[in-house]
Regions:
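Structural beta-sheet core signal
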Residues: 3-5, 51, 124, 149-152, ...
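Solvent-exposed polar/charged
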Residues: 43, 115, 213-216
Length: 268
C-alpha cells in the first residue's frame, strides 16, 4: 500500500521556522516531522510514499538526496573523494517526490496525484500530525465496511484544564485533558482511488467539498483512535512534542520493534 503525505503548505503559524522550509521539515528531536510520520508508517508496514510537494519542495528533495549523509556518521577522504557511511541507516523506502503546485489547496494536491495512486487503496495524511494509530486495524476496518473513504477520528486535547467539583470543593484538577465527547479529523485516511472524483479543482480544500460530499453520499466512515495524536500547528505544540521526544517516552515512537509485515492493498 502507498501512503500519500501532504508536504506543500506554508505553515504560517510557525513562520519563524518555515521562512526557509516547508512545515513538514520543521524538526522535533532534530528530525523533520515528515521523517517521524514516515517512520510511523514504516513501523506499520507501509514503505512506499508519494510526497505532495509545494512551497520549498526543493528543500524536501535535497533532504532525501542527502539522506544517508544527514542520518549517518561519515568518514570523508578529501584527497581521494572517498566517503564511508557508518551506521548505515538505510530504510527500505520508495519515495516519489511530486510537485503539486505552490498555491494548490489540499484537495487539489491529492487530485494532481491521481495517476500515482490509481492502482489501489492508499493511505492519505498530513505532514504535520503524529499518532500511535494501528494502521493494520485501520485498513481492516476500511476493508470490512466497503466504502470509498475512512478517516481516523481522534479526541482533541482541551485548551483548558478542567475541574471536578463537589459543591465549592475542588476534588480534582486535570490539565490538558481530552474532550471525551468530541471526535475530530486526525488525518490518516484510507481511500479508494475513486474518492478523488469528489475533488473538482486545484482550489478544492479536501476537508470541505470532497469530504462533505463523501459523507453526504454515505461513503465516509470514521475509525476511532483512542490513543495518542497531536498535530504541530503552533510553537506550543512543537514544544510539547519536543518535550515528549526528549523524555524518551514519545507515544508515536513505535518503531525499533520487530518489523511489521507490509500492509497490502484491500482485496489482496
Amino acid at each position: 500500500m502507498k501512503a500519500v503525505i501532504l508536504a506543500g503548505g506554508f505553515g504560517t503559524r510557525l513562520s519563524e521556522e518555515t521562512i526557509d522550509k516547508p512545515k513538514p521539515m520543521v524538526t522535533v528531536g532534530g528530525r523533520p516531522m515528515l521523517w517521524h510520520i514516515m517512520k510511523i508508517l514504516d513501523a506499520n508496514g507501509i514503505r512506499e510514499f508519494v510526497i505532495a510537494l509545494g512551497y520549498r519542495g526543493d528543500y524536501i528533495k535535497q533532504y532525501f538526496l542527502d539522506f544517508y549523509a544527514i542520518n549517518n556518521d561519515l568518514t570523508i577522504e578529501l584527497a581521494t573523494g572517498e566517503t564511508t557511511i557508518h551506521d548505515d541507516d538505510r530504510p527500505d523506502w520508495r519515495i516519489h517526490l511530486v510537485d503539486t503546485g505552490l498555491h494548490t489547496q489540499t484537495g487539489g494536491r491529492l487530485r494532481r496525484l491521481r495517476r500515482w495512486v490509481e492502482d489501489g487503496t492508499f493511505l492519505f495524511t498530513y505532514g504535520d500530525g503524529v499518532a500511535n494509530v494501528d494502521i493494520g486495524a485501520l485498513v481492516e476496518f476500511h476493508r470490512l465496511h466497503g466504502k470509498l473513504a475512512t478517516v481516523t477520528t481522534v479526541r482533541p486535547p482541551s485548551r483548558f484544564g478542567n475541574l471536578a467539583l463537589e459543591g465549592p470543593q475542588v476534588t480534582a484538577f486535570h490539565e490538558k485533558s481530552v474532550l471525551s465527547e468530541v471526535w475530530i479529523n486526525g488525518g490518516y485516511f484510507i481511500l479508494e482511488p475513486s474518492a478523488i472524483d469528489y475533488i473538482s479543482s486545484d482550489e478544492a480544500i479536501w476537508e470541505r467539498e470532497p469530504v462533505e460530499g463523501l459523507a453526504n453520499d454515505g461513503q465516509l466512515m470514521g475509525y476511532r483512535h483512542p490513543g495518542f495524536w497531536s498535530c504541530m500547528d503552533t510553537f506550543k505544540e512543537k514544544t510539547m512534542l519536543e518535550q515528549l521526544w526528549g523524555s524518551g517516552e514519545a507515544p508515536w515512537r513505535i518503531w525499533g520493534q520487530d518489523p511489521a509485515p507490509m500492509v497490502r492493498s484491500v482485496g489482496d
